[in-house]
């Protein structure tokens, strides 16, 4: 089951599966009943009234001191909370406060023993800081933090503090009398200084008045010079303005003449334009009409030539297409002829080979005898036996031709004589 606690309280869960124990400050925790245990510890701030009665100071004077301290168990620091749980778990707030009070009182007594009454009485802040510092370093090991410490009261049974007050009162009265005498002395000195400063101020005032008079006269002379200069400049400016006005009048007159002359020129230009228009109407218009007519004729001739050229181009294109079609038809016919020859060769294998050889033999013979037809002169050499002359040439040619079937057989592997004597076979 779940257990919750506020921010001023911490829970410690121990038992099964809780080693080390779980500490939760201001939250909730799940606890297994019967096998786990939950304990709570207060995190409230405790106010302690720390009294130290008749403690002997450094000079052996017994005094009593009362201080107010605010302490609490620190729940945000896990280590301090663990230390506080080890020392105070299961104890009440009163018991925790009593332990902290005893610790603080011991440190307060120790600090009082190391200081004089005057130091404690006059410098309470120093005493409070020392107690706070020493006590905090000790209580932090218990998990307790000192929030604040203030010295509330100091008293004694020997009238030591009262005697200190009397001595202080006498010192104050003495200081007051000395201060009064010094004040009277300072007043006389200040009065004399005031008189001296008054005379000095009077002299300085007269000097300043003389300087002011001098500056006035100098400035007045400068102003007079400036006024006369400005007056002369004004007179000169007037004369210059009169001259400028006359010059402007003359310029206006010249401008009027220029305008009149410009108007005359404009009238002349209008007359010239009118005459040019008359000339254009009488001469230029007919010439332009003739030129326009010639341009139209040239354009018509140009269009006719372009149309003729386009017609010729179209004729050439159609002739080319017809020739291309004829070439294609001829190529198709040749291809068809070749295909039929291939079919015939496949059908009549040896006969077809013989036919091809016989068809090409005249061409071979023509190529062999070709060089003889182009020869201009034949020179024969003989060893003295056999025929001579033309019969010799004819015999050589016939001998070449008779050996032609053997050459064909060596090149193609087909014997013309054997093919000729064999009966035809189909595939």
Swiss-Prot record:
Q: Which UniProt key words apply to this protein?
A: Cell membrane, Endosome, Membrane, Phosphoprotein
- Functional note: May act as a scaffolding protein within caveolar membranes, functionally participating in formation of caveolae or caveolae-like vesicles.
Provide the GO biological process annotations: positive regulation of cell junction assembly; positive regulation of cell-cell adhesion mediated by cadherin; positive regulation of endocytosis; protein kinase C signaling; protein localization to plasma membrane; regulation of receptor internalization
What organism does the record attribute this protein to?
Answer: Pongo abelii
Entry's localization field = Cell membrane; Endosome; Membrane, Caveola; Melanosome
Question: Pfam families annotated for this entry?
Answer: Band_7
UniProt lists the family membership as follows: Belongs to the band 7/mec-2 family. Flotillin subfamily.
Where does it primarily localize?
A: membrane
Looking up InterPro entries in the UniProt record yields: Band_7 (IPR001107), Band_7/SPFH_dom_sf (IPR036013), Flotillin_fam (IPR027705)
**Which parts of the sequence carry Phosphothreonine?**
387
- GO cellular component terms attached to this protein's record: endosome; flotillin complex; melanosome; membrane raft
State the annotated membrane topology for this chain: Peripheral membrane protein
Q: Does the keyword Phosphoprotein apply?
A: yes
* PTM annotation (Phosphoserine): residues: 19, 163, 385
Q: Which GO terms describe its molecular function?
A: protease binding
Q: What is the name of the protein in this document?
A: Flotillin-1
Its subunit composition reads:
Heterooligomeric complex of flotillin-1 and flotillin-2 and caveolin-1 and caveolin-2. Interacts with ECPAS.
């Amino acid at each position: 089951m779940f257990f919750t606690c506020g921010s001023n309280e911490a829970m410690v869960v121990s038992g099964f599966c809780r080693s080390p124990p779980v500490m939760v400050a201001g939250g909730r925790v799940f606890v297994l009943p019967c096998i786990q245990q939950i304990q709570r510890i207060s995190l409230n701030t405790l106010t302690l009234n720390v009294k130290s009665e008749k403690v002997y100071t450094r000079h052996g004077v017994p005094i009593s001191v009362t201080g107010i301290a605010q302490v609490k168990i620190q729940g945000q620091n896990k280590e301090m909370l663990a230390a506080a749980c080890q020392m105070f778990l299961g104890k009440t707030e009163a018991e925790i406060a009593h332990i902290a009070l005893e610790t603080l009182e011991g440190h307060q007594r120790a600090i009082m023993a190391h200081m004089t009454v005057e130091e404690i009485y006059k410098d309470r802040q120093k005493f409070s800081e020392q107690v706070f510092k020493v006590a905090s370093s000790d209580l932090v090991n218990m998990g307790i933090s000192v929030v604040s410490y203030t010295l509330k009261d100091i008293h004694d049974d020997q009238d030591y503090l009262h005697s200190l007050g009397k001595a202080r009162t006498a010192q104050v009265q003495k200081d007051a009398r000395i201060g009064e005498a010094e004040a009277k002395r300072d007043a006389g000195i200040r009065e004399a200084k005031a008189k001296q400063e008054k005379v000095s101020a009077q002299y300085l005032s007269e000097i300043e008045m003389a300087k002011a008079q001098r500056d006035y006269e100098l400035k007045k002379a400068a102003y007079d010079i400036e006024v006369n200069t400005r007056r002369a400049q004004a007179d000169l400016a007037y004369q210059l303005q009169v001259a400028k006005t006359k010059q402007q009048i003359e310029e206006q007159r010249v401008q009027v003449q220029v305008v009149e002359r410009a108007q005359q020129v404009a009238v002349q230009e209008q007359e010239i334009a009118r005459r040019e228009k008359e000339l254009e109407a009488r001469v230029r218009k007919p010439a332009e009409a003739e030129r326009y007519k010639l341009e139209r004729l040239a354009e018509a001739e140009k269009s006719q030539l372009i149309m003729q050229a386009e017609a010729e181009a179209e004729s050439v294109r159609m002739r080319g297409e017809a020739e291309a079609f004829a070439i294609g038809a001829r190529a198709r016919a040749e291809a068809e002829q070749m295909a039929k020859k291939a079919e015939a060769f496949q059908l009549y294998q040896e006969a077809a080979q013989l036919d091809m050889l016989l068809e090409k033999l005249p061409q071979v013979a023509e190529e062999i005898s070709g060089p003889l037809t182009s020869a201009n002169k034949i020179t024969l050499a003989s060893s003295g036996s056999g025929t001579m002359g033309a019969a010799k040439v004819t015999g050589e040619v016939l001998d070449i031709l008779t050996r032609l079937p053997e050459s064909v057989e060596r090149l193609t592997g087909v014997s013309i004589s054997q093919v000729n004597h064999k009966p035809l076979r189909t595939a």
